Amino acid sequence: MNLYKRGLVVGKFCPLHQGHELLIKRAQDACEELLVVSYTRPEFPGYEPARRERWLRAQFPQAHIVVLDDARLAALCAARGVPARHLPHNDDDGELHRHFMGWLCWTVLALPVDAVFTSEDYGPGFAQVLERHYAGGPVAHVSVDQARAQVPVSGTLVRQDPHAHSAFLSPIVCADFVTRVCVLGGESSGKTTLAQALAAHFETAWVAEYGRELWESQDGILNYDDLLKIGREQLRREAQALLAARRWLFCDTSPMTTYFYCVEMFGKAEQELARLAEHRYDLVLLCAPDFPFIQDGTRRDEDFRARQHAWYQAELARRGIAFVNVSGSVDERVRQVAQVLAARMPC
């Protein structure tokens, strides 16, 4: 039997870490309903409301999730016919934050609580303020791992270097901090070899080219409808690989390549495939066609490779996508990419 009717957990969740998850799970176990509120002012880059909401909803689908910025708060106030307020600043007095939450739960959300769960020393005072706002009964405070003995981490610590503290993050949260690197290139330009070599060098995951896998499974025959299937499956596998990647994910091809082949083979492409081809990466590598051309029975010829390489150059420029040219041997290419990635890492 649940001890409380409706519990409350409040936090920035920038990012959502295992300490937060422990707190929310304990609250869920003790309550019939749970209200989870996230806000921060100012926002932290990379921890936008939509992202925080996605994490919370994925991990706690049964909870009532409210993630706020000033615009979202204004919309809630308008829907209730309540004069809008601004979110309190993170540096404002704690009492102001507590009264803000009392107003939010009672006046804006109409969701009074009878318990608040925290890992902070302000918890008892928070419960007292909420109780005064509701005037409908006591509000209990439940402390969870205040000493950080079970989960020795904080949001401030994780923000300094999410990768160094990835053990305290769920895979869905870690995935949003992975740098996605796409490797493009014409046929027999070494892109698959490079993607594999980079994954081995950086001890992380890579995503193979699904189109080739399907082509081989269908005895070298691809139909028009297969190309959209390839684009969808390539991105599905990419999203799955993000959950296992460490800092970087290397992708052998992208839906833009699938789009190229669809138009090349059939003279047209579905609108959905064109949209999938807009999928963006954090870094794009374009392999120079300076490898000896190897005919493995699936490829065309060197002239086609050169034309495909030129198409990539023109199409990336047309889409406003910056890219890094890589050339030389596999080892030389790995060194080139390592230098680029090192320059992108925080000091």
Residue ranges, per PLM feature:
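Short amphipathic alpha-helices and their capping/turn segments at secondary-structure boundaries
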Residues: 23-27, 53-54, 193-201, 229-244, ...
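The conserved Walker
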Residues: 187
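Conserved substrate/cofactor phosphate-moiety recognition/catalytic segment
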Residues: 196-240, 337
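Conserved nucleotide-sensing/catalytic segment adjacent to the nucleotide-binding pocket
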Residues: 220-268
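A glycine- and Lys/Arg-enriched "phosphate-lid" helix/loop adjacent to the NTP-binding pocket
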Residues: 266-332, 336
